[in-house]
Amino acid sequence: MKHLLLVRHAKSSWANPGQADFDRPLNERGHKDAPMMAKRILDRDITIDSIITSTALRALTTAEYFAHANEIPKSKMIQHDFLYHAPPERFAKAIVLIPDEIHTA
């Protein structure tokens, strides 16, 4: 059975009002909280085989913190443009695309 953990991106910055939403980075708090949340997953003895993420900057940066904590190389992260502002059916599509060898993402 596959297990899917849903994690929202860490706190993002609104410092540049003209910046495209897709390109908003994490703010200082986001950079502090993301590794702490990744550690909480590890502390619960949950082993993540892969990370699936939107390519939006704040989501990708958060995913990289989780990848680092779980020793998952960036090359093994699965990135989907279609997850940005995705309705439920796009998440279903991402789930179907998970390779068989991945048990927890």
List PLM regions with ranges.
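Active-site-proximal alpha-helix that buttresses catalytic centers in soluble enzyme cores
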Residues: K2-H3, V7-A86
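Generic beta-sheet signal
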Residues: L4, E101-A105
